[in-house]
Curated annotation (Swiss-Prot):
Residues 1-9 are cytoplasmic. Its main location: endoplasmic reticulum. PROSITE patterns: SPASE_I_1, SPASE_I_3. Catalytic component of the signal peptidase complex (SPC) which catalyzes the cleavage of N-terminal signal sequences from nascent proteins as they are translocated into the lumen of the endoplasmic reticulum. Specifically cleaves N-terminal signal peptides that contain a hydrophobic alpha-helix (h-region) shorter than 18-20 amino acids. The active site is at 44 (charge relay system), 83 (charge relay system), 108 (charge relay system). Its EC number is 3.4.21.89. This is Signal peptidase complex catalytic subunit SEC11. The keyword Transmembrane applies.
């Protein structure tokens, strides 16, 4: 393979990464979120969502309604939680939400921060679920939970780039 072919492959790879990054940033701006896509990591929302489903989020709604499926983050915890709004209270300044997983027996009070009885929509909510793709996100779960799968996948990608003819 000559230098021109190698440069062409490198530029094509750069184009793919730049396009993916621009698509991600466009989705972020349109949805008003830093992360407009999340993967379901547990079975707490079954049967609505299964582990490995990809969820598309939106954060341009003024208020949440009872029954909306929301994604929220708790201070001190790194993993976002996907649950349904069970109860809501609001006044002119803020909206407070109580959530619960469809497959859970009790509400999420035990998941919230200490001395927190409700989620504050402005501070805790990441977004509202507007759509999903079933099971496509399962690859990310396999990569994060299985070290051998991660290294095997990286090895295959490396080998394919070494032996490609284009």
């Amino acid at each position: 393979m000559n230098i021109r072919q190698q440069l062409t492959q490198l530029l094509t790879l750069g184009y793919v990464f730049a396009s993916a990054f621009m698509l991600w940033k466009t989705l972020s701006v349109v949805a008003n979120l830093h992360s407009p896509i999340v993967v379901v990591l547990s079975g707490s929302m079954e049967p609505a969502f299964q582990r490995g489903d990809i969820l598309f989020l939106w954060n341009r709604d003024e208020k949440q309604k009872v029954g909306d499926i929301v994604v929220y983050e708790i201070e001190g915890k790194t993993i976002p939680i996907v649950h349904r709004v069970l109860r809501e209270h609001h006044n002119l300044e803020k909206q407070l939400l109580l959530t619960k997983g469809d497959n859970n027996a009790v509400d999420d009070l035990s998941l919230y921060a200490k001395k927190q009885s409700y989620l504050n929509r402005k501070n805790d909510l990441v977004g509202t679920v507007k759509g999903y793709l079933p099971f496509i996100g399962y690859v990310t779960i396999l990569i994060s939970e299985n070290q051998y799968f991660k290294f095997g996948l990286l090895g295959l990608l490396g080998l394919s780039s070494l032996f490609s003819n284009e």
